[in-house]
């Protein structure tokens, strides 16, 4: 049907004359054209307005980016100045503090050993953690499982013979297979437990030794490590790649299990979700074994902090076996505890050459707020600490 016949069809059904019909049709066409022009103009104006807004936003973002860069550069400059003067102040301080005939390092050791212990809430927390470390160490020794003190706890052991006064946690390390053994050994223990949880947002396992029946979440951290075929950069890179692959898979919320896991945040390894998540973690561990990155203790030349550990997977996390084993013994708060064989080398690697100095800036990361549990914390100390 052509348009002429359409108009003819409409014309014979309208109660108006031909002239009136044509006039009315022309009026309608003019209105349609007007609406079309108005619509096109509106679209054009909207498009132009959007472009103007985009340009304005781009200019503002560029300006803010420049400001951020300037602030970052200024902050870096100020940090260098503060660090410079901090070092100068420290040099002057140690020069004044040093006794006649005493070396600077001996003066530093004397100073840090003379610092008073923590007080109040922080000290009560430290005392409970010390009690846990005592039990942890005894259980490991009785069952021929090797552990050692690490990070801030190792620094405190060497520098303070105990806790750094402003610290509030204990860090230990253990081989993956010994952690599995320890969990089994403690299964029926009435006093202590080893909790192992998958952390959806840390992309790792949280492993903690603590009291079985306690109203307070007091614990010591246990970081796993794996035996490596080689103490090489290539081993670290393979471990790091797997860590990144695990992180990517645990971020994929198109997967229903991952959505459920991330909604829960943290799940016990023995829970329904935990057992499903374990399949993902085990897949990456088996990959490292199959690729001959990881091996058994007897074949290892090095070890890696595990890809599923909370520890950051940086390039200091590959070590030769000889740097850590055989373990040595040092005093920590009156306890005799394991430390790495070359513990001074490890501390220099972690904290730089001069760890016998005051921290520049904020010295302490607060791991938990215990003020609301102050009374309960004191009661737990009386009950448990001998």
Over which residues does each language-model region extend?
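Boundary detector for helix-to-coil junctions that initiate low-complexity/charged tails
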Residues: 1-103
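Helical scaffold of the NTase/Pol beta-like nucleotidyltransferase catalytic core
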Residues: 75-149
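Conserved catalytic core of two-metal-ion nucleotidyltransferases
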Residues: 118-141, 186-240, 244, 252-351, ...
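Active-site nucleotide-donor binding segment shared across nucleotidyl transfer reactions
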Residues: 137-170
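Beta-sheet entry/capping signal
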Residues: 146-147, 171, 329, 336
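Surface-exposed, flexible loop/turn segments at secondary-structure boundaries
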Residues: 155, 180, 228-230
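Catalytic metal-binding acidic patch
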Residues: 160-182, 334
């Amino acid at each position: 049907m052509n348009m002429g016949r359409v108009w003819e069809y409409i014309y014979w059904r309208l109660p108006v004359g031909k002239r009136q019909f044509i006039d009315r049709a022309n009026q309608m066409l003019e209105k349609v054209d007007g609406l079309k022009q108005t619509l096109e103009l509106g679209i054009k104006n909207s498009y132009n307005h959007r472009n103007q807004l985009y340009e304005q936003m781009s200019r503002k973002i560029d300006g803010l980016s420049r400001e951020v860069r300037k602030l970052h550069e200024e902050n870096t400059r100020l940090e260098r100045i503060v660090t410079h003067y901090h070092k100068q102040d420290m040099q002057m301080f140690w020069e004044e503090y040093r006794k006649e005939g005493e070396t600077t390092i001996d003066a530093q050791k004397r100073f840090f050993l003379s610092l008073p212990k923590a007080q109040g809430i922080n000290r009560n927390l430290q005392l409970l953690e010390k009690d846990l470390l005592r039990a942890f160490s005894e259980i490991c020794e009785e069952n021929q499982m090797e552990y050692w003190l690490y990070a801030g706890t190792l620094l405190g052991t060497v520098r303070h013979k105990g806790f750094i006064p402003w610290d509030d946690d204990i860090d230990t390390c253990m081989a993956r297979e010994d952690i599995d053994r320890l969990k089994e050994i403690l299964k029926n223990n009435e006093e202590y437990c080893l909790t192992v949880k998958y952390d959806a947002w840390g992309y790792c396992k949280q492993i903690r030794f603590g009291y079985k029946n306690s109203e307070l979440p007091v614990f010591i951290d246990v970081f796993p490590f794996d035996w490596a075929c080689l103490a090489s950069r290539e081993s670290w890179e393979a471990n790091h790649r797997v860590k990144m692959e695990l992180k990517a898979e645990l971020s994929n919320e198109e997967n229903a299990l991952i959505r459920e896991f991330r909604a829960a945040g943290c799940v016990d390894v023995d829970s329904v979700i935990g057992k499903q998540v374990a399949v993902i973690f085990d897949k990456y561990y088996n990959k490292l074994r199959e690729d001959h990155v990881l091996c058994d203790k007897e074949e290892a030349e090095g070890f890696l902090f595990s890809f599923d550990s909370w520890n950051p997977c940086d390039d200091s996390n590959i070590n030769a076996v000889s740097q850590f084993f055989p373990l040595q013994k040092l005093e920590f708060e009156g306890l005799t505890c394991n430390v790495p064989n070359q513990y001074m080398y490890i501390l220099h690697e972690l904290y730089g050459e001069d760890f016998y100095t005051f921290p520049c800036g904020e010295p302490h990361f607060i791991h938990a707020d215990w003020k609301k549990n102050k009374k309960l914390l004191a009661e737990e100390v009386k009950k448990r600490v001998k």
